Amino acid sequence: MNRLFRLISSLISLVLLLIVAQPAKAQNNPYADDKRLHFGFSLGMDFLSYGVEEADSLLQLDRHGKHGKPGTIYHARTSNVGMGFSVGFIADLRLTRHLNVRFCPGMHFGERTITYKSYDKLDNEIKGVACSNNKPSVLSLPIDIPLYLKWSSEREVNCRPFVTLGGGVSFDLGRSKERVILQKMMDYFFEVGIGCDLYFPWFKLAPELRYRLGFNNVLTPTADCEKEEWPLPADDYFYTDALSRLTNQQISLVFNFE
């Protein structure tokens, strides 16, 4: 985590240095925004988590004996922030002087984790889940197909702030039946971002901070998992049955090269 923090700090420092190093009066690439259509690519760092909702009733050992130790109640406490990165393609269509529409398909690589706690009614204490893993991870390899509107302010020498608003659909190729939580493949999402175009003689660099919120409940219930011949032992079902809803959440620091 410390190495990641240092990496992010270094990248932010580099961007700030590039902004400061821009000539005070000379305007680089003055006709960059006059193109009707242009292309580029993006590289990003992702901070991944879930919106977690527990099951309506506290989960105990049910009549099928599928939920762990008898007399124990399981809680899905929190979603830990996971790390990832992304690569993407940019197609930008200029509509007006200040408004563009952008098609930015991309692929993300990362993991999300959930922390579980158990309450033993016999011992009357809260403790970590008595299992092999009380922080199971869910691999995430989504391919995004988003569409954005980008509104830009007036250009000031070699800087031009902007905001983006849009959404799209995501198909998760990391969905694996070998995980104790089976995530649904498709999700719809809303995304908002803020950034700044930095103009250089031959290209634009646009650092952008984005927030994404998934709409769908991506949790696959155990009943559906069984239909898909879920290979996990029944003792691990409590990971899913302690939950009622999971939604994808993500904050990204993206560097757009155009």
Where are these regions (language model features)?
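Bacterial Sec-dependent N-terminal signal peptides
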Residues: 1-31, 255-258
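Flexible, solvent-exposed loop segments that connect beta-strands
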Residues: 53-78, 111-138, 174-183, 219-243
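Predominantly the C-terminal beta-signal and adjacent terminal strand-loop region
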Residues: 185-187, 201-258
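Gram-negative (and chloroplast) outer-membrane scaffold detector with strong preference
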Residues: 27-38, 45-49, 90-175, 254, ...
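Conserved binding-pocket/active-site segment within a compact domain
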Residues: 171-176, 184-188, 196-197
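Residues that define the transmembrane beta-barrel architecture of outer-membrane proteins
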Residues: 35-37, 81-85, 139-143, 159, ...
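Short glycine/proline- and aromatic-enriched beta-strand/turn motifs that initiate or cap beta-hairpins
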Residues: 26-84, 250, 256-258
